[in-house]
C-alpha cells in the first residue's frame, strides 16, 4: 500500500476510535451513558443514573429508578413508572406513564394517561398535549 493510502486509512481508523470513545462518555447528567430500550412485551427495571432513557416498543412494563434528564416513550400500550424526570415525552397511543416529580410533559398521540405527583421546584409541569383523549393529571 502506498504511504498516502496508509495515512488515510489510519486517519479514518483514528476518527472512528475517537467517535467510539465519545459515544461511551457520560450523558448530560455526567454519570454514564444514556439508556436505550427497544423491545416489545417486556418487563424490566432501568437505572437512570441522571441520564436520559428512551423506551421504544409496545406492551412493555418498565420501572425507571433514580433521576433522569429525559424519559422518552415511543410506542403503544406501554406502562412506565419513573421516579424523578426533568422531561417526559410520550409518542403513541394508550400508554400509561406515572412520574413522581417532573418539569415538562409532552404527549403526541391518543388515549394516553400521564400522572405526576409533584412538579419540579414545587411548580406545575409545563404540558404540551397533541392528540385526543389524553389524560394528563396530578395524582
Task: Please describe what each predicted stretch is.
Residues 22-139:
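Extended beta-solenoid/beta-helix repeat architectures
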Residues 11-20:
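Bacterial N-terminal signal peptides
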Residues 2-12:
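Bacterial N-terminal signal peptides that target proteins for export
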Amino acid at each position: 500500500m502506498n504511504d498516502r493510502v496508509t495515512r488515510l486509512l489510519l486517519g479514518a481508523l483514528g476518527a472512528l476510535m475517537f467517535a467510539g470513545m465519545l459515544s461511551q462518555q457520560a450523558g448530560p447528567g455526567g454519570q454514564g451513558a444514556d439508556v436505550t430500550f427497544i423491545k416489545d412485551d417486556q418487563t424490566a427495571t432501568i437505572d437512570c443514573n441522571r441520564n436520559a432513557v428512551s423506551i421504544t416498543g409496545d406492551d412493555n412494563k418498565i420501572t425507571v429508578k433514580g433521576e433522569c434528564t429525559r424519559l422518552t416513550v415511543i410506542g403503544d400500550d406501554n406502562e412506565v413508572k419513573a421516579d424523578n424526570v426533568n422531561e417526559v415525552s410520550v409518542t403513541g397511543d394508550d400508554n400509561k406513564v406515572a412520574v413522581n416529580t417532573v418539569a415538562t410533559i409532552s404527549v403526541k398521540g391518543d388515549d394516553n394517561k400521564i400522572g405526576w405527583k409533584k412538579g419540579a421546584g414545587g411548580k406545575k409541569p409545563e404540558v404540551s398535549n397533541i392528540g385526543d383523549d389524553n389524560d394528563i393529571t396530578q395524582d
